Amino acid sequence: NKKTKKKISAVVVVHVLGNSANLLELKKICKKNKIYLIEDAAESLGTFFRHKRMRKHTGTIGDIGCFSFNSNKIITTGGGGMLVTDNKKFAEKARFLKFQAKKNTYYFEHTEVGYNFRLPNPNCGIGFPVINIEIKIAGTI
């Protein structure tokens, strides 16, 4: 950033109302500048980004994809969400923080501030069948 002289770590792109952003251009800029691309796909679950022969779901093109299952979203569980990534380091860090940053020991040791981001089982029971229906519908389009 020229004004603050700080390095930009990530760009967050928001796909709104089922419309995909121009991901090819953003991904190219991010890759060139070694910046992570994070997709907020809360309002675009089931949307495809298409370019020539490429057809990929929004939320799966950047380094991290974020989805929401709040009551006003495409699939609802009454709350919660989903994070997707193919970066092993990011996935491990997300799992660690999700379980209150507790180390895998027999005693309780927290090495940093963690969160309780686990969705209760009844909420999963509400959302899971809907996800299966969405997958079947998406496969026919």
Question: What do these predicted regions represent?
Answer:
Residues 7, 60-61:
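Alpha-helix C-terminal capping/helix-to-coil transition sites in glycosyltransferase folds
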Residues 2-12, 17-53, 87-89:
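Catalytic PLP-binding core of fold-type I/II PLP enzymes
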Residues 43-54, 61-141:
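Active-site region of PLP-dependent enzymes
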